């Protein structure tokens, strides 16, 4: 999952740079990060999500089961979705993290 996370992060960063402009992004990394937190995320690896104040990427979490060979209906039909956990419930609450960058 490391590669998928890197793909998601870089794609979102490039979208934020395009939004603020290359010159502004080079001048202020803080402005770029603020834009990344303000913009919703959306990519093929994790789908829609957000970045909260402490920098954690929030997205739904999925529980899949591998199908038996006879249940598969063709190529790449290997998994059955059992449960989806909303992004707000899938990660530790912001207040429980103790991040010094987040001021209550």
State what each model feature region is:
Residues 1-104:
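Extracytosolic ligand-binding ectodomains
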């Amino acid at each position: 999952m490391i590669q998928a996370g890197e793909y998601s992060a870089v794609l979102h960063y490039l979208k934020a740079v395009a939004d603020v402009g290359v010159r502004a992004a080079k001048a202020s990394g803080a402005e770029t990060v603020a834009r990344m937190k303000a913009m919703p995320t959306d990519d093929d690896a994790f789908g829609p999500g957000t970045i909260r104040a402490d920098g954690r990427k929030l997205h739904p979490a999925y529980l899949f089961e591998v199908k038996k060979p006879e249940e598969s209906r063709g190529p790449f039909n290997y998994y059955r979705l059992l449960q989806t956990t909303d992004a707000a419930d899938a990660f530790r609450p912001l207040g429980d993290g103790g991040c010094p960058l987040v001021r209550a």
